[in-house]
Amino acid sequence: MATKITGVFILILTITFSSSSAVTATQQAPSSSPPVLTCTEELVMFSPCLPYVSSPPNNMSETPDPICCSVFTSSVHSSTGNCLCYLLRQPMILGFPLDRSRLISLSQICTDQNSEESFESLCSVSESPELPPLQSIQFTNPFVSGNNVSASPQSVDLAPEVSPSSDLFSPETATLAPPPPPPPLPVLQYFSSDSLKIRNFWFPSTIIMTFATSILARI
């Protein structure tokens, strides 16, 4: 009797454990699926295609890289495939210009479709009237052509603060300098009344003597 009870108990534990394992496996299955990329992440993942789709002087490649084709194909066929339409509608979204014709050609080069307008038709207003929301991104252009660095989001340099120069007036540091001396007064010649009388006397006397001398000289 005890043996039968033990066997039934073991059977119940086995069934319970099997049911718990099945429920746990069912609950863990959805978590193994890869997360869906956001629109911003789709554009960042598109970076291997930039050497091909960038406008001069950033067009460093004449053919797209195999990684570019893989990223483009997976992005176009994903649920957020129209995120790449930002590249066609806003060519300067990454901070530097993109070649529209090369963007459209990726449909023919990287996919099995023969239609060159497949990517363009996907991004048309009729197919994608509204694009998914896009978070703000700052995409740095990694390409350099010759000695010129390609256009990239610029950092704003703030002008340095101007320190007060030594010749500016400062109430705290200014010292009062003595005023300049007044200009010298003009020198005036003063004469006493006696000397003025003598000068007035000699002046007509001289004229008379000169006039008398000239008369005597004529006689």
Curated annotation (Swiss-Prot):
Glycosylation sites: N59, N148
Membrane in keyword set: yes
Protein location: Cell membrane
Entry-linked Pfam families: LTP_2 (PF14368)
Gene3D superfamilies named in the record: Plant lipid-transfer and hydrophobic proteins
Residue positions of covalent lipid attachment, annotated as GPI-anchor amidated serine: S192
Protein keywords: Cell membrane, Disulfide bond, Glycoprotein, GPI-anchor, Lipoprotein, Membrane, Signal
Transmembrane keyword on record: no
Database matches in InterPro entries: Bifun_inhib/LTP/seed_sf, Bifunc_inhib/LTP/seed_store, Plant_LTP_GPI-anchored
Region (Disordered): 152-181
Family recorded in the similarity comment: Belongs to the plant LTP family.
Segment forming the signal sequence: 1-22
Disulphide bonds in the chain: C39-C85, C49-C68, C69-C110, C83-C123
Species of provenance: Arabidopsis thaliana
GO cellular component, one term: plasma membrane
CDD domains (UniProt xref): AAI_LTSS (cd00010)
Propeptide stretch(es), residue numbers: 193-219
Recorded topology in the membrane: Lipid-anchor; GPI-anchor
SUPFAM superfamilies: Bifunctional inhibitor/lipid-transfer protein/seed storage 2S albumin
Main location: membrane
Protein name according to UniProt: Non-specific lipid transfer protein GPI-anchored 25
Function (record text): Probable lipid transfer protein.
Domain of life: Eukaryota
